[in-house]
Amino acid sequence: MENLKNVISQGLIMNRAQRRQQQRAEKKAHAKGTNYSIDMEMIQPWSDVLMKVKLPDEIIDAMLEITDTILQDPDRKNWGDNLIAYVPVFRLELMQNHNIAQGGSVFEFLMNVVGEYIKQCTFQQATRQDHDKVAGIQWLTQMKSAWIVSQWEGEYNPIHIHTECSLSTVMYLKVPEFLPSTKPERDDDGCIMFIGAGHQNSRLTRNIIKHKPKVGDFFIFPAHLQHCVYPFKTDGDFERRSVSFNADFINKAEWEKQQQMMQQQQQQQAPPPVQGAPEKLTINTAA
């Protein structure tokens, strides 16, 4: 019996020692801090979205071929007067007829990217709990106009916006090696700059962003977003070539509703049939 008591007492002592050890470990862990898995969501429906895409080599090569054809055409249409910078600009019309290996045309590829931009902007306007409501929306896109910008050393484009469209784009096909800026602390030469609506005194947002373009960079942005292009210097006669286009979009369901309303209005405005008119009119041309 005495031996049994000793065994039980020894067991209790061990259990108490283990409990104290566990308590000390818990206190130590609490002192270090506890890691939690939390769910976070950034909500910014009021922000203009600037999307940057890296174009596949096949699209870059296709666009170079298309723009070479246009720039070498002596009968090309010069749109230079339509731009504030008066740079050489040309109408772009060959994308629809240039097919790519993945299927479809260069035009369809670019408009699909535009569609993805619209989709992401739509998601940004909704909180996560409403994503299911907007995920099924189908968008129709339309390219309003397209042009080439062929710039050389010293040429630039001052701050401007695009009109008569909802969004704009720019893709870079040729980018020369720029010489170092005359102000190393401000390496802006050759940059494209976007100017948003962020407050200049805000420490949590920026109202200006600059990017030194590389071949294949493709930007999509709201047409009202101000932007400009800085001049550049090179050690030779090298071209910076980009292609831009303006686009618009509409919810497919809304478009179909508009078409239906237009048809109804046309039917209502059509003149009523003449009462008592003969089914067949015979014209006698005999003298």
Where are these regions (language model features)?
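N-terminal acidic, proline/glycine-rich, low-complexity intrinsically disordered segments
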Residues: 2-5, 16
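Short acidic, low-complexity intrinsically disordered linear motifs used
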Residues: 11-27
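Non-heme Fe(II)/2-oxoglutarate
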Residues: 29-136, 154-157
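Short hydrophobic/aromatic beta-strand or adjacent loop that forms the aromatic wall/cage
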Residues: 46-50, 166-168, 240
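Short, solvent-exposed secondary-structure capping/transition elements
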Residues: 123, 127, 178-182, 256
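Catalytic core of non-heme Fe(II) oxygenases with the double-stranded beta-helix
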Residues: 140-220, 230, 237, 246, ...
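Catalytic core of Fe(II)/2-oxoglutarate
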Residues: 200-287
